[in-house]
A protein has these predicted regions:
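Short coil-to-helix leader/linker segments, especially the first N-terminal amphipathic alpha-helix
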Residues: 1-7
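Loop/turn elements at helix/coil->beta-strand transitions in domains of secreted/extracellular proteins
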Residues: 14-17, 181-184, 213-218, 252-257, ...
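Short hydrophobic beta-strand that contains or immediately precedes a catalytic carboxylate
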Residues: 18-22
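Conserved SGNH/GDSL esterase-like catalytic core that processes O-acyl groups on lipids
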Residues: 25-243, 250, 334
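Surface-exposed patches in mature extracellular/periplasmic domains of secreted proteins
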Residues: 27, 42-54, 257-260, 306-307, ...
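Active-site beta-loop-alpha junctions enriched in small/polar residues
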Residues: 190, 223, 262-264, 310
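Catalytic His-Asp segment of secreted/periplasmic serine-dependent ester chemistry enzymes
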Residues: 203, 264-366
């Protein structure tokens, strides 16, 4: 990924697509939103990136774009759990929009301070057709057997409306990109998700999406929900993680991979816990998950970010929740807005430190 960032920073016109897949920490778009804004401030705005094809849950509020739906049915794939069944027709967003009512619409509106989009990409499966409208520019998209289709407006627009025309259409994702160059960061998170949910995504759909999106970096941000599973099998989890790394490398061979180690999180209702009130402590499986993630990353050559350590280590979730200006919610699992900005800034700073070190080594070699 650093090579791609270097080309972009040098004015080479290359775009850098970062794709983060994970759980509620990713779905909320507050941590990824901070990282996106910071990277785009330095390297340029490559667009909002990939979004679910609808409003997947109440309170959905992605940064940089407003999404509204009218008679538009959006379905979240059931969580895989321990069964791990493959969810046919479900791609990396974990969401399907099944349009059975002609005239149903989905509208995406960019923030006014952002560059206008120059390409609209939709991924789905027919036989139904989709109308894509940006003001008075209108296109009709047919997916047939499935895939991703792009349209390029001739003029500047900040709003796009998708309208179902006929028959049944399954839409998997929507992508908005800006002018060539800059960073595009897509946050594809599902509340409650584990790595098994990524494993359950339809292989054919995922292959088509990754071929179209061409990410420079894929970030895996799972682990919290596995850590609250007292029956976690460490060997099975390690095999699953290794398998998903192999899968992503096969489907996106040009992408770098990074694992965000599971952050600190606390469970309520314990005795003699590490929290200030003694009632909370990390679930035992959380350290197991983190150890597997770190060890596998080192073994297979995947970047690893120590989220747990960078937020303060053991029981930091309690300290961050009880500080003068809290950075975490009272559940000691999720970050609030201020905390998301803080930890997103820490991640950005660490990435830039690594990038500068890489640039210095490359300059010395030349």
């Amino acid at each position: 990924m650093f090579e791609a960032l270097s080309r972009t920073e040098g004015g080479g016109g290359a775009s850098v697509h970062i794709l983060q897949i994970g759980d509620s920490h990713t779905a909320g778009d507050r941590i990824t939103g901070k990282l996106r804004a910071a990277l785009q401030a330095r390297f340029g705005d490559g667009g909002r990136g990939v979004l679910p094809p609808g409003v997947p849950y109440d309170g959905y509020a992605p940064l940089q774009v407003e999404v509204t739906a009218s008679d538009w049915t959006t379905t979240l794939a059931p969580l895989a759990g321990n069964a791990g069944y493959v969810r046919a027709g479900v791609g990396l967003t974990g969401v399907q929009a099944i349009t059975v009512q002609p005239g149903s619409t989905l509208t995406l509106r960019l923030d006014t301070l952002l560059p206008a989009f120059v390409r609209i990409e939709v991924c789905g499966t027919g036989p139904g057709r989709l109308q894509v409208a940006a003001d008075d520019e209108i296109w009709t998209v047919a997916f047939d057997d499935g895939g991703c289709r792009s349209v390029r407006p001739d003029r500047i627009h900040r709003q796009v409306e998708l309208r179902a025309l006929d028959d049944v259409l399954a839409l998997h994702a929507v992508r908005l990109t800006s002018a060539p160059g800059g960073v595009e960061l897509s946050n594809l998170g599902v509340v409650g998700a584990t790595l098994r949910d990524l494993a359950a995504r339809d292989q054919r759909v995922v292959a088509r999406e990754l071929a179209a999106w061409r990410p420079a970096l894929i970030v895996l941000a799972f682990g919290t929900n596995e850590g609250f599973d007292d029956g976690l099998d460490a060997r099975a989890y390690e095999a699953l993680l290794r398998g998903q790394i192999v899968r992503l490398r096969r489907l996106a061979p040009a992408a770098s991979l990074m694992i965000l180690g599971a952050p600190d999180a606390l469970r309520n209702g314990v005795v003699n816990g590490c929290s200030a009130d003694g009632r909370r402590s990390p679930p035992p499986s959380l350290a197991v998950v983190r150890d597997v993630q770190r060890r596998v990353a080192a073994d297979v050559g995947v970047a690893f970010w120590d989220w747990h350590g960078r937020m303060g280590g053991d029981c930091s979730a309690d300290r961050l929740a009880t500080r003068g200006e809290p950075f975490m919610l009272r559940d000691r699992v999720h970050f609030n807005s201020a905390g998301s900005d803080w930890i997103g800034g820490v991640l950005h700073a660490d990435l830039m430190t690594a990038y500068e070190a890489w640039s210095a080594r490359r300059g010395g070699a030349e």
